[in-house]
Design a protein with these regions (language model features):
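Short alpha-helical
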Residues: 63, 88, 162, 252, ...
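Hard-cation-handling environments
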Residues: 233-373, 388
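Active-site neighborhood of phospho(di)ester-bond hydrolases with catalytic His/Asp-centered motifs
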Residues: 25-27, 52-61, 68, 80-83, ...
Length: 465
């Protein structure tokens, strides 16, 4: 049953019932406007949390993991299976999400009070996130684990973020004459050729596929030129004598940029300037990256032993304290690079840097990731001359640059390549995690190239395999 991320890219939740056991694949937050998000996330209209037996989590991104504390709070008491790195990232990301839930509820209640409506409670608190973590069981890649009667789970590297997995369920269907069925949930698929991570692993002998379609019908810039393009933009920007402000996702993108900067400085392709990572979540995530070399590609793994730490270098400052963050906005501060969350500029310390730095033509804002419609990041990327930050208009005089080749999601061609490398009959495929136009484009391409039955998932629909 498709319970989320059908016709959209957030709120991943897919319910599988086999041999009387109810298995939930992912339990993500739907992300949209505050009031709409709260209404969608507060209850589970497609199932009773207390009747779910097992959760299998593909990766730590909040649109896949973020409603787990609420699920547990509302009665789920079973095990949550994830990779070791995913569990460690969830420890910091779910706590951070709880903090955001409390802030969002505060804003939402102000609006409700104006309309004469009673206040609502946060979806969950930090203690709920902490309790939820006790239900996690960690499994390594490609190590089969019996889940329940007739079902074995195996994780395969998805190459999307640290710890991201494709979920293979090997099923002996006792309601269908003990037939063996291999069901694969893609999770989110990486591009391959990532600066840090291994490529997605082809999964063998697959019968049924539940597949993401985020970038169906859309191609990215080639990842092979990302480092050089990044270095050239930075070199030109630093010549102006200003700051380079980089809005970046705290998990994966920040660490990717740190590794690339380390390479650029190490090879002399970029002159050394101070680099500040101004995001407590990103700082914590970077520490987790260091303890999970099993997720690294061969190049980074070798660098780890030859050069020590791929994410730490001379001139790097990891900023936790608010006072230190505020000092970065001092007008006497010389040329530097500031990496700060959030990537879409909707929250976090990046908004303070933009408020103070957008008006200076010596400064540069460099976007390295996706910005959704109706976000501050999208407005700046699209060239708006005045933006609203903290309720006040801010003139945009800084230089605005964009690199799209750092994307963590496979594009259209890469999704087709991933599907083609997978072996087995692939009797039926369902597409999720994509806007309808993206899913439709990928469905048409898969059908044309590979044949077989390919359907776009419909929210609330139940199918039998």
């Amino acid at each position: 049953k498709f319970c989320g991320a059908a016709g959209t890219t957030t709120g991943s939740q897919h319910l599988l019932e086999v041999n009387g056991t109810r298995i939930l694949l992912d339990c993500g937050l739907y992300q949209g406007h505050r009031s709409e998000s709260y209404e969608v996330n507060c209850c589970f209209p497609h199932f009773d949390p207390g009747e779910i037996d097992i959760v299998v989590l593909s990766h730590a991104h909040i649109d896949h993991s973020g409603n787990l504390p609420n699920l547990c709070k509302q009665g789920f008491s079973g095990n949550i299976y994830a990779t070791f790195a995913t569990r460690d990232l969830c420890q910091i990301m779910l706590a951070d999400s709880a903090h955001i839930q409390e802030q969002d509820t505060e804003w939402l209640n102000k609006d409700r009070a104006k309309d004469g409506l009673p206040p609502v409670q946060p979806l969950y608190l930090e203690e709920d996130a902490e309790r939820c973590l006790r239900q996690f069981i960690s499994i390594g890649y490609e190590r089969p684990m019996p889940l329940c009667d007739g079902v074995t789970l195996t994780f395969f590297d998805a190459g999307h973020i640290l710890g991201a997995a494709q979920v293979l369920l090997e099923i002996i269907d006792k309601e269908d004459g003990n037939k063996k069925k291999r069901f694969l949930f893609s999770g989110d698929i990486g591009r391959g050729r990532n600066e840090i991570l291994r490529d997605p692993v082809p999964v063998p002998d697959v019968d049924f596929v539940l597949m993401e379609s985020t970038y169906g019908g859309r191609e990215h810039e080639l990842p092979t030129g990302a480092t050089d393009a990044f270095g050239e933009i930075l070199a030109e920007a630093l010549k102006r004598g200003g700051k380079v402000m980089i809005p970046a996702f705290a998990v994966e993108r920040t660490q990717q940029l740190l590794y690339v900067l380390n390479q650029l400085f190490h090879t002399g392709k970029l002159r050394r300037v101070p680099v500040y990572v101004d995001s407590p979540l990103a700082v914590n995530a970077t520490e987790i990256f260091r303890i999970h070399p099993e997720c690294f590609n061969e190049t980074v793994y070798r660098f780890l032993f030859d050069e020590n730490d791929p994410f730490i270098f001379e001139g790097l400052h990891l900023v936790r304290a608010v006072t230190e963050s505020k000092r970065l906005n001092d007008s006497t501060h010389g040329p530097c690079i500031i990496i700060s969350a959030s990537g879409m500029c909707e929250a976090g310390r990046i908004r303070h840097h933009l408020k103070n730095g957008l008006g200076d033509p010596k400064n540069t804002v460099l976007f390295v990731g996706y910005c959704a419609d109706n976000t501050l990041g999208r407005a700046i990327r699209d060239g708006r001359k005045t933006v609203n930050i903290f309720g006040k208009p801010v003139q945009v005089r800084a230089n605005i640059e964009t690199i799209d080749s750092f994307s963590g999601h496979a594009d259209h061609s890469e999704l087709l390549d991933w599907f083609g490398r997978m072996t087995g009959p692939k009797k039926r495929t369902w597409l999720v995690h994509g806007e309808s136009t993206r899913s439709d484009a990928l469905r048409d391409a898969l059908t044309d190239e590979f044949g077989g039955a390919v359907d776009v998932a419909v929210l609330g629909e139940t199918v039998t395999i």
